[in-house]
Each structure stands twice: as C-alpha cells, then as structure tokens.
Amino acid sequence: MSTRFLRVCVLTVALAAVAVGCGSSKSSSTSSAAAASSTSATSTSSGGTSTPGISVTSFTNDFSAMNALKPLAASGKGKVAAILPDTTSSTRYVEFDAPYLKKAAAAAGLPSSDMTVENALGSDSTFVTDAESAITNGATVLLIDPEDSGTGVTVQRYAKAHGVAVVDYDRLTLGAPAGTADYVSFNNVHVGQLIGSGFVQCVNQWHVSKPNVVVMHGAVTDNNATLFAQGYNGVLASYFQSGKYTLVARTAGTWMPPDALTEFEGAYTAHHNINSAVIPNDETGAPIISYLQSHGVKPKTFPTTGQDATLTGLQNVLSGYQCGTVYKPIYLEAQAAVALAMYLRAGKTAPDSLLNAKTVDPTTHVSVPSSLLVPEWVTPANMNDTVIKDNFVPASQLCSGKYAADCKAAGITS
C-alpha cells in the first residue's frame, strides 16, 4: 500500500463482546491513538537522552524511514529475535513477515548476526523452545506471534525473568502480566469491519436479493479471530435483526484450510439454501471457493470474503468468486515492530507517535501500549493502486493463464 493509504488510528474504538464459534468466548478491546509527530522530530527517553523520533506514518515500501534508527542500533545491546507461528494458516509468514523483518532490521543498521527469525511450524512447544534458545543466545528483545495466548504468556514470563523485552507481533497475548510487552498490529476490529462492509457492498453489487449467510470464524484460541469477528458481526447485526439477511449457520472456527472446508461442507449440506459466506481469510476461503466451483456455482452469484491479499485470494476476487480481501501491508507492520525493538534494545522510550494507541486486554483489563496500523479493502477497482503498486503480488503472477482477461478488465497489465 502506498503511504496515502496509511492513516493513524485516531478514534476510540469500543468493542462489544460477541460469540465466537459455537461457544460464547467473549472478548472486548479498546484503543485510542495519540497524535503523530513527523519523522524529523526527536523524542526524549526516560533518562533525558535525545533519541530519533518516528511515527506509524513514517514507514513506506522503500524502508527509508528505518535509516533514522541507526543511532539506536549502534548504541543498543544484544540481539533481536522474531518467532513466527506457522507456515499453514497463512502464506504471509514465509513470503512476507520473515524477509520484511530482516530487511527492516538491516535498514535500521542492525547487523544480520543480531537479527534472527524463527518459525515454530505450528508447535507450541517449539515456539517456547525457540524463545528460550534465543534468550540463551543473547537476545535482548523478542518479537513473538504465538498461535495461542497460553504459549505467549509462558514466553513473556520467561523473558521477564531474564530481563528481556517483548513485543507482541500481530497478535495480542491475552492474560500476560502487566508491563511485560508492547503490541504491534493492524487495527483488527477495523479488519473485521472491512470484511463486513465489503460483504454488504458485494451482496448489493452482485444482486443477491435474499442472502442466506454462513458466518465463519478463525481459531477460537486466537484473539485476532475474536477481534475480526467483533468487526464483521457488528456490521452485519442490523441486517440479520431486520430480516434483510438470514443467518443460517455459524461455524466453530479454525485457521486450518482443510478444517474450514469441512465446517463449510457440514453447513452447506445441512442448509442447501446457503448462498453467501463471511470468511475471515483467503487461505480458509480458497478450498471453499474450489468446492463451490466444483458444484457449479457461477461467478458473482455467491459472495465470499477474505483477508491477507494472497495470490489465490486476489485471483478469486478478480474472477468473481470473492468480494474482496483485506490488504495489510506487512512491510509497514514489520518496520513498526523493528523500530520499537530498536528503542527497547537501546533502553530508550519509544515516542507516542510510534506507540500511538492503547489496547485493553479483555482478560486482565490491562492497557497495552500499541502501534496500530490501518488496513485496506481491496477489490478489482483498487487492486492496481494497492497490491500491484506495492509489488505485494507481481502482476505477472496475478495475471497468468486464465486470469489475464480478468486483469485486463480491471486495468492491470503484467
């Protein structure tokens, strides 16, 4: 996403508790943004030392803003270790997060030997072991994205006992002791709101007169899934209450694509009138769309949604099987996380323009200092100006084979 799409979150967001999956996993969160300073500003640490100022609006796809952090990299001590969750729930961790985190660290002046990125491959025990090993090997800052909060709490407690700073990367760890971590992510309730409003717009544009909807969810152990659901359920509530839409089924929730397909097949088999689906990400939506295609569903007749702007998701959007996808420019998130790590590693206080929000942990009611970025809803109408312009997905890949005509219709040239 180009910088004109990035805005600082300036509203207080009050989130109602919602049922996630078949149970009643309730969660609420609030955030508020502080005013942003310019890149050239300076901030003063708790020790009175002048440090480079940086804002969530500073970051661009050329990583140039990270240059301002070189003095912090030079004065800081120890290594920065990032631990990512898996390779299956989303392609982002391998394709984008890992290389972007390394690129951001290099641009900030951190030697490659002082920046490590590990992937736990879906194993909670591996995640904890990776964190402990990183600390043993000299990490003074951890960037962690565990699949569940229990694992995150274990890591945060171990890190605190060893004097290591922690940044929750992309997911907030619920139930963590106060003051053990900061948080970097996109505004995840807004992600859900984009999914919900995109679905509504699509229902209208595709002329689905009587939407019979299955609402799907991410894993119930993932706080992000809860926040996404709060967003789209909030948008859709009035449509269900008024009878304009019919809520036919809700699924239990998963980030595993085969399991998501199984959940959808169960609902679709039990309710043949289902003609639309709210799906929280592209990876879980892909097998569902393939299933619908194999059952003769035509383009622009069965609205579905997604998130992460994967290659397959974008192609499904272009071909009329998915309404749109939430684009979260991961290069922005990676830079924000590494920037925060540079302050922590140097023992400095990050400016309010970087930690621009507070996120309330619904289990402890602790306010967690947060850096929140703003996502974008992508359709064929703005695909060229977002994911293609950013080279998030190369046009040559997007427009290959049978998608060439769809790209041409959307004004995308490879």
Task: State the predicted function of each range.
Residues 4, 22-414:
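A residue-level marker of the well-folded mature domains of exported/periplasmic proteins
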Residues 10-16:
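Hydrophobic helical h-region of N-terminal Sec-dependent signal peptides
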Residues 1-9:
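Bacterial N-terminal signal peptides that target proteins for export
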